[in-house]
Each structure stands twice: as C-alpha cells, then as structure tokens.
A protein has these predicted regions:
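Surface-exposed loop and adjacent secondary-structure segments within mature catalytic domains
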Residues: 63
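Active-site histidine-anchored catalytic micro-motif
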Residues: 127
Length: 257
C-alpha cells in the first residue's frame, strides 16, 4: 500500500505573490494542501482564489507571532499592540495566558469559516508556535474538540516530554524543506528518511511563492521562488511515486478520533 505524502504550503494570504505561488504549486506541481493566515493582508484575495480552486484543501495557519491579533491578547502583544517573536521568551517566562490564547484561536477559527465558508481541513501554526510546551495542550484540545487534524512535530513532542492524545495527524512532520540551499534532492531525502523510520504518512512544510513588492520585505524571500521551481519540476512526481508515496491531504483523515 502506498504511503501518504502531504506537501503543505504555509502562509496562504501573506501577500498576492504568495497566494499565486501556492496556486501555481498546487495546479502545476506537487503541493497538495495549504494553510491560511486569517490575520494577513491578502487573506481576502486568498479566499477568493480558494473559491476559484475549490479542490484546494485549505487549513488554518494559527498566527501568534506577527501582525495584529483578532482579540486584545494582552499577554502577548507589544507596546504597539502587535504580535512579534517575543512569544518564545514569554512562554519560557510563564507569562502567557492560556485563556487569552484559546480565545484568539477560536476567533481565528471563526474568521476562517467566515472567509472561506467552511471549516479548515486542519490546523498548524506560523513559526510552529503551537508546539511550544505551554501552548500544545490547548491547541491539541481545540483540534480534538472540533475534530480537526493537527500538524504534530514528533521531535518537539519528545524534546519537551509532551503527551499526544490526538490521533488525526501524520506519522511524521518535516520542516527542513526550507533555507538557502534547497534542491530537488533535499526534498526526496526527507521522503527516504521518513521511510526508514517506518512512517506511513508524512507532512512536509513549504512556502512556494512568486515575488512582489510585499514579498521583498520578507526575511525569507528568494528561497520561496526556489521552492516554487522545485515543487513544479515535472520530474518530481515520478520520483515521489518511485519511493512508494502518493500525494494526499487531511481531507482523507477520518472526521473523528
């Protein structure tokens, strides 16, 4: 039986170049799903594109490290009322308010439904903040309550000594398709390593994008274009199939655990 491979494009809604890049990688390449930032500047454009491509599975990319939150979130915003990368320090200091985080997650979930007209296919987060030991239990509980699959980094689970109760997830998640030196072999190596671990399902994160003025302001810009080129390489699908994988998405997971 073939192994399931989810290649998920994060950051849907970040800017129009990102949105168009994800659509290109989905229709012309091997991206099999995406996750949307409902607080991002181009989210309405992303929702419009999703309406034009209803076969694209769209999940929620929970945001706690950039932009404006939907709720006051006083435990996390800076003096300008913005989210930033201070979440890691605040998590270590124990100053995060779980109820505030839960309310923000619920608000982003409801905004997703308003924008896309349906529930997300699954949940993950920007900068993987849901894997912080102070946040994982509450995000996992929310996903279970709503019967939504969840991106779970088993390495982070082991490193923090966390317990996993949610069964709707891939056996393995890999975030290493990222950086300045990406090649097609980089991606294929991740498949080979997951196979050696005996995983029957694997999720790989990616960020394929074109480049526009907004994207040029990102600290991770040019590599997104490289990702797009790799993920739309016509030689890639047979190499994936040769390794016993087929492209999948979280719509295939059962609706309850």
């Amino acid at each position: 039986m073939s192994k399931r491979l989810i290649i998920n494009a994060d950051d849907f809604g970040l800017c129009r170049a990102q949105n168009y890049g994800i659509i290109e990688a989905f229709t012309q390449g091997v991206v099999s799903s995406t996750t949307a930032i409902v607080t991002s500047p181009a989210i309405e454009h992303a929702a419009w594109l999703a309406g034009r491509f209803p076969e694209l599975p769209v999940g929620l990319h929970f945001m706690l490290s950039w932009g404006l939150p939907l709720t006051p979130l006083t435990c996390l915003v800076n003096e300008q009322g913005m989210l930033d990368k201070g979440i890691w320090q605040k998590s270590e200091a124990g100053t995060l308010d779980p109820e505030e985080i839960r309310c923000e997650l619920a608000s982003q979930y409801q905004r997703f439904i308003t924008l896309f007209g349906k529930a997300p296919t699954h949940i993950d987060s920007h900068h993987h903040v849901h894997m912080l030991p102070t946040l994982y239990p509450l995000v996992e509980a929310f996903a279970m309550e709503h019967r939504l699959p969840l991106r779970i980094d088993r390495g982070e689970i082991a490193r923090h000594g966390l317990s996993v109760h949610h069964t709707l997830s891939c056996d393995q998640f890999d975030a290493r398709f990222y950086g300045e030196q990406l090649t097609r072999d980089t991606l294929l190596q991740l498949l080979d390593e997951a196979d050696e671990l005996g995983a029957s399902s694997l999720e790989i994160m990616c960020h394929p994008s074109f480049i526009d003025l907004e994207m040029q302001g990102s600290s991770y810009c040019q590599p997104r274009l490289t990702e797009l080129a790799i993920l739309t390489d016509p030689a890639l699908p047979p190499l994936i199939a040769k390794r016993g994988y087929r492209l999948a998405n979280y719509r295939e997971w059962p609706t309850e655990s």
